[in-house]
Amino acid sequence: MGIVLGPNQYGKAENRVVRIYRDTERHEIRDINVSTALRGDFSAAHLTGDQLQVLPTDTQKQTIYAYAKEIGVGQSEAFALALGRHFVNDTEPVEGCRIEIDEYDWERVSVSAPDGTKREHNHTWVRKGQETRTTILTIDGKGEAGTETLVSGFKDLVVLKSTGSEFHDFLVDKYTTLIPTADRVMATSLVARWRYLGTDVDWAACYAGIKQIMLEQFAEVQSLALQQTLYEMGRAALEAYEEVAEIKFSAPNKHHFVYDLSLIHISEPTRRS
């Protein structure tokens, strides 16, 4: 059997960009982590070590920094589109690319004014710890003949509800020890990704709105299973935003089991099972 080179791509991972705008007395900050991967016919680099078709990964890094200065860092989706279109359309050997951006949010520190009121500080922030906003852009082909697929979302959003969740009537075998319950704590570290139908989108408004809908559904749905809650979260977001084609979730259970205090001879009030 012959040996052949399989599909391949290459790029520069995790290029951290912190862009601070100091045009006015009130500064603004944008904090992103950008990874690039380029696709094309790079077989010569693998088979003979010929680098003539290879745009160095260091050049990709420098391009990210240059674009952060030249076009600015606004919405991550717009930055990814500008960067990806440049690599594919302006670099002859490149036939496609994947741009991934993680975005980190900061909020202003609140300080006391001379009159005793609180105000937001003009140039000091504290890093928010809720979730990381994500953007993934895939481009296949050059110019108008190419296709652009943009997926937005978030990861590491930890949510918990202390009631309003049930789990019972499940399949049981000889190894099952889980006790059915009509009232439990439900928690997860949520990853959500939604694919847009196009690129003429108000990215910030969509992100904020979709996240809010998902949180409301998580809170309000009387959950018989985490899967049911996720479906309702996705359904509600899709109904509200026609710009979105599909939504995918990853949501591992973060279990919170009731501890049997009778083991240490402490009684507790009767609770629903």
Where are these regions (language model features)?
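Hydrophobic, ordered structural segments
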Residues: 71-152, 156
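Single conserved hydrophobic/aromatic residue that forms the stacking wall/gate
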Residues: 264-273
